[in-house]
Amino acid sequence: MLAHDRRHAFGPWVFAAAAAYFLLHLYNILYMLNEPENPAILIWRFSGSMGLVPDAMPLIAALPAAAAFAVDLNSGFAVPAVLRSGTRRYLRSKLLAACIGGGLAPFLGRLLFVGLLHVLYRGDVAMAAEMFGPEGAMGIAFTGMAGYVGYFAGVLFVQFLAGAFWALAALAFSAYVPNVLWTVCLPLILHRIFLELDAWTNLPAWLNLSLLQDSETGLSFAPGLLAAVGVFGALIAISAVLFYRRGKRRLTYA
């Protein structure tokens, strides 16, 4: 990865976006802060699926690095960068930066929130099991400490994949329309389009990206994780190919 792109993938925008995502989750549970008797996993369940969190996640993922290609083209930096590094290396660097930066922002935001939950609330698996039972993705969290940790690890991994996709979708768009504002906003628009398609076509829950990114599809843990890896993995690959092909063509005539 080029030094310029490393600053996008691991720089201050990643941590700023992660902090914003963390604060959105915290805002959703403000009314429950005076209820420390609740189990942490119950508060977690409510925090991620309410309010602005699902809708804002695509924007959070796009902030760190998705617009880097558009910025380079508009500033004239792309041409000398390609001359120094070569087209293939330059485009791969942009893909890697968007993937890592887009995935890390929601991942770190939720990881910090998980830590806070287990400071404010009890990690009571038994009580949560009584409330929710063994159904759905949360079922594995009720099988002991290994399942409890595994549940959160799986959900955080899905968040990383979802963030990587939204960022790469925006990056691919920027190769066709190198406008910074439109590039950053594209994931929000795309997210709404997917929601409307789901409402009109009645697709399975595991194809609803809003539910899938929050592991709320109703599937048990392993099938839900496989569905997320398959769906987001395929979308990541498609976005990467679209960006690489169009980006290469655009740089040829830059």
Located regions from the model:
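Junction motif at the cytosolic side of a transmembrane helix
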Residues: V231-A254
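Central hydrophobic cores of alpha-helical transmembrane segments
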Residues: A17-Y21, V180-F194, L207-S210
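Juxtamembrane non-transmembrane "cap" segments at the membrane-aqueous interface
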Residues: L120-P134, I189-L207
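Membrane-helix interface segments
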Residues: F10-W13, T87-R88, R92, N179-W182
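Helix-loop-helix units of permease transmembrane domains in multi-pass membrane transporters
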Residues: A68-L104
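Secretory targeting signals
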Residues: H25-A68, L96-A175, L212-G230
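Aromatic- and glycine-rich beta-strand/loop motifs that create alpha-glucan
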Residues: M1-A18
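Helix-loop interface residues and adjacent transmembrane-helix termini in multi-pass membrane transporters
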Residues: R84, Y176-V177
